[in-house]
Structure formats: structure tokens, C-alpha cells
Amino acid sequence: LHIYVDRRPEFQKSYAFFATNYGGMDMKFHLDGQWRDTPAGVAHFLEHKMFDTKDGNALQDLAANGASPNAFTSSAMTGYYFDSTEHFEENLEILLSFVSIPYFTEESVAKEQGIIGQEIRMIEDNPDWQLYTRMMQALYQKSTARTSIAGTVESISHITAETLYDCHKAFYTPSNMILTVVGNVDPVHVADLARRILPREGGPAIPRDYGQEPAQVAAKETRMAMEVSAPQFLTAYKCAPAADGEDYLRTAVLGDMACDILLGDSSPLYQRLYEEGVINTSFGGAFEMMPGVAYLYAGGDSKDARRAAAEIQREAERLAAEGIDEDYYQRVRRASFGSNLRGLNSFENIAVTLTEGYFHGYDPFRFPQVFDSITKEDVAAFLRRNLTAERAVLSEIVPREN
């Protein structure tokens, strides 16, 4: 197990984050000599069930001990964490124990299917969720990135206790996990405790299959009518994915910079569309990366989604052709660097950043050097390569007509 301790002796609070390199996209993998196909939503379902122990519930144990525990599942990671000002080592022991010792019964799985099924029905009624999910399904034909992390009511009905044990065996092994601790702690004590509780064997590396994704998008447009007061849109671009290593960090920084320069609230595009009433303050964008995929998207409320999407495309082409104004580039660069730096004030942010770096084979603390190496020409080239009309999709949610 890889352990990372960031000592902060001046703080009362300590934070522990125990994560596995396993998330919603990891549906097909090779275990015990054969390929396994698992239903959509298993990683998220497993995260919910991990808190069950033979003696009760680890969430309650941690809370009773003064800790604030929680967990999340993303497309490529599942993380369990807590922060506390007292009984830190005791709480860490509880965390490491319940995550490494699975306990599932068919009864508890059936009960959870009802609970998560209700959650899924609720999120399916959420316009933001539909807008984003339909955008992903328009972007991707084969990649499991197009699948909702929670799965569907139908897909989770196929999950059994055996499915959960198999996935735990495959991915909850020390070699596929990392423990990150930030705060007023003794690194030696943390390592000793982990050594005492966790299994000695690392476990083999598990091959995964995310699907062979073609360069073309799956669908250019998707539109759905729902109970919303104003029409909403997301336009997205299917970008070239990055390999693990420093290239992954560089692509992440480059994509974020491109996003800020093209779409940020001080950008010429934002100012113009806002003044013309095409967008409002709900408008925003982001660049995301997952195993084998990367995409840049933007949107918000708009009465003219097609015009907004066309203007974003036009501005990307203009910046790619004419280049980026030097003063504007430096201003955005400083703001972007500053917000990355401020992120280091948050214990949770540090832990998640270190974890992502470890899973993707780069050192996140090298971001100042990577930042310095990126030029405005690099950003223009990124826009030229990735933000083309063929790579674009449009997802819309419109008010239902009574």
C-alpha cells in the first residue's frame, strides 16, 4: 500500500482519505482467469455497502467517536474519508478495517437495491442530471464513460452479494489503493497502524476494458422536454485523451486553461453573450478527463441554445486562428495558478489531488513547472485540435408544453 502523509502540526484537525483505483467506468475486468462483465452501478453500490460490518455500521462507529465520515464514487475512483480533532488513530483503524473487510448478505443487498433504486428515480427527475448524462451519451459510442455511475434501476437489480465480493477482491487490494493523511499526525504511527490492519499481499494488477472508442461522436444533438421553467443546454467537445504520467497532468492544466480563456467570465465571449442576453450567470464550463476519454463542455440557461453553441464554436476557431491576446493570457494564467494554489489550503483537496496523481502516475506538486511550460500557442493549438465542429455535440432540456 502506498501511504502519503502531509504533516500539519499547527492544525487541530486531521483528515484521512482511503481510496481505490476503481469507479463507475470499471464494469468489465479480468479476474481469476476470465473476463467479468458487471452491471452498471456496482462501484457506487459497493461504496454504500462497505459501511456494513458484522457488528453494525462503521459510519455510526466513526460518528460516535467524534469523526465526520463520508464516501464518494466517481468514474475512476472510490474514496472513503473522515476528519476529526480527537481519537484520530482509533478512527483511522475503523476506516482501514471496514474498507478492507467486506461483509455482504443477500438480504442487505436486496434492501440496498430498494434504497438506491429510489435515489436513481430521484436523480432521473433532475434536469441537470439528464442534461449531463445525455451529453455523455451523445459524445461516446462505446466507452463506459457514457454510463451513469449510479447505474439504472434495472442494472442494479442484477447485483448480488457475489458480485460485490468479486469486485472487492479485484479492486480493494493494497496495490490498487492509497492512503492519504493530512494533519497533526505522526507518519510512523500511521504506517504501523496500516501495517497491522491491512493484508500483506498487494494483489495482482487487474486488466480492464473500457470499450474501443471511435473518434466520431455518437449523436450530434439530444433534446428532452421536462418540468423546467427555462431551457438549459450543454455543448461539449470530444477531446483527445492523454496517457498516464506527466502528459496527463499537462493535458489537465492545458484543458483547464483553454476553458478559462474561451469561456471564463472575463472572456470576450462571455461578456458579449451576457450583454446580448443569450446567456446568464448560470453559464460555465469545465474540462474533464477519465480513463481513455477527455471532454470540454459549457452551458447553462439559454433561450437560444443553438446560437450559444455556434458562438462558442466560432470563438474557439477565432482564437485558434488569430492567437490569444498576451495581456489577457497572462491575466487568466495568474488567476488559474492562484486558484490551484488556494486549493492546497483544503485538506480534502490535497488528499484527492495526491490520490489522482498516484493513480495516473504523476506528481501533482509539479504543477508549477507544468504551468510554466505552457504557452498561449499551446492553448491555441489545443483549441485547434479539439474544438472542431465534428467533435461537438449539443444537449438540451426544454420546458414541457402543457
What are these regions (language model features)?
Residues K54-C167, N280, E311-R314, E326-V352, ...:
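Acidic/histidine-enriched segments that form metal/cofactor-coordinating
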Residues D32, K49, G79-D83, Y103, ...:
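Second-shell loop/turn segments in exported
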Residues A138-M177, G211, N340, E356-R385:
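Histidine-acidic residue clusters that define the catalytic metal-binding segment
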Residues L1-A58, Y165-R272, A309, A392-N402:
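His/Glu-rich zincin catalytic helix
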Residues L234-P241, I261-S302:
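A structural supersecondary motif
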Residues L296-A298, S302-D325:
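Extended amphipathic alpha-helical segments enriched in small hydrophobics
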Residues I178-V181, L319, Q330-N402:
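C-terminal regions of mature proteins
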Residues A205-G211, G284, E322-V332:
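Flexible, glycine/charged-enriched surface loops at secondary-structure junctions
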